[in-house]
Design a protein with these regions (language model features):
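Active-site groove signature of glycoside hydrolases
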Residues: 123-146, 165-174, 178, 264-265
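P-loop/Walker A phosphate-binding loop and immediately adjacent motor/lid segment at beta-alpha junctions
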Residues: 19, 246-263
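Acidic-and-aromatic substrate-binding clefts and catalytic sites of carbohydrate-active enzymes
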Residues: 37-42, 65-77, 103-107, 140-146, ...
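N-terminal pre-domain/capping segments
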Residues: 1-128, 146-149, 156, 163, ...
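Structural motif
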Residues: 57, 224-226, 258
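Acidic/histidine-rich catalytic cores of soluble enzymes
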Residues: 61-62, 152, 156-252
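Residues at the N-termini of beta-strands
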Residues: 60-61, 93, 133, 228, ...
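A cross-domain feature marking catalytic cores of carbohydrate-active enzymes
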Residues: 30-34, 64-66, 93-100, 136-138, ...
Length: 273
């Protein structure tokens, strides 16, 4: 079902003792997307995620993905089962990554409002599970500046709703202009709300075709607003180092920003997960 270990910065997390992990300058969580192939193939169930995180990988914090329990957002019985399983294992539920709920920067005002309201149930679910945030997307359409205004509007309105429930709205570089660090940092600045921030992803900086935004520059731009971090990996060399990202350089950027929260392992390659 699973092969290999979980690596971060060329070091297998499974090789570290609990004492060594406690002395690390950051904490490690597991993003559920890392297991998307085994979940979608029905080899494991979403409800087993906490158990696998704890007993297979030795980690104690998780990041859920809404598409794996998409029809359960309002099912308190199901959410309670998730919560019980996590709590019984000492697992900390950090956030829910939310997709397929519309574009928060949709140029159509009605569609933008619908997208905002579609996320309300996930804010409620996050609060129930004890998460600090939901991760959303800032997709839009139009000119560069028009998309800034549209995404800012959608994010601000959703954040104002989530504020009353104590849940942060965090935006990942996850498609469209959000893969441009300058653009996304400008949007967050314009939202101008302490509960709206970023979730910098080490790998999602593809602009279009073979054009990529500099990932180190992008993460540097997004870290001042970060409330979570996604350590994206696709493949590793024989020494366990990521083949696309210099993790030593990237982790230094994260730590130099003053961030000391969780870094979520997110594997998106073809060999594991």
């Amino acid at each position: 079902m699973f092969s290999g270990g979980i690596s971060l910065s060329g070091i297998s997390v499974l090789q570290l003792s609990s004492c060594e992990r406690k002395n690390m300058p950051f904490k490690i969580s597991l993003a559920e997307w890392s297991l998307h192939r085994t979940i979608r193939s029905k080899k494991i169930d979403h409800l087993d995620f906490s158990d696998i995180t704890k007993n297979k990988f030795g980690l104690s914090a998780v990041e859920y993905v809404n598409v794996f329990f998409f029809d359960k957002a309002n099912d308190k019985g199901y959410l309670n089962e998730m919560k019980i399983r996590a709590d019984d294992l000492g697992i900390k539920s950090l956030l829910i990554m939310c997709d397929s709920e519309g574009n928060l920067g949709d140029p159509d005002p009605k569609q933008r409002t619908k997208a905002i309201e579609n996320h309300y149930k996930w804010v409620d679910a996050a609060r129930f599970l004890g998460c600090h945030s939901i991760r959303v997307n800032a997709r839009s359409a139009g000119s560069y500046d028009e998309q800034i205004k549209l995404a800012t509007d959608g994010l601000r309105r959703l954040t104002e709703f989530a504020e009353d429930l104590g849940i942060n709205i965090i935006v990942e570089n996850h498609g469209g202009l959000s893969n441009n660090g300058t653009w996304l940092s400008k949007v967050i600045q314009d939202v101008d709300h302490p509960m709206c921030g970023t979730l910098p992803d080490f790998g999602n900086f593809k602009i279009e075709g073979n054009t990529w935004y500099d990932r180190y520059k992008g993460v540097s731009e997004l870290m001042p607003f970060a409330k979570a971090v996604s350590a994206k990996s696709y493949s590793f060399d024989h020494e366990g180092n990521d083949t696309q990202t210099d993790y030593y350089k990237m982790i230094k950027i994260v730590l130099d920003s003053g961030y000391n929260g969780y870094i979520g392992i997110e594997y998106e390659g073809n060999e594991l997960g």
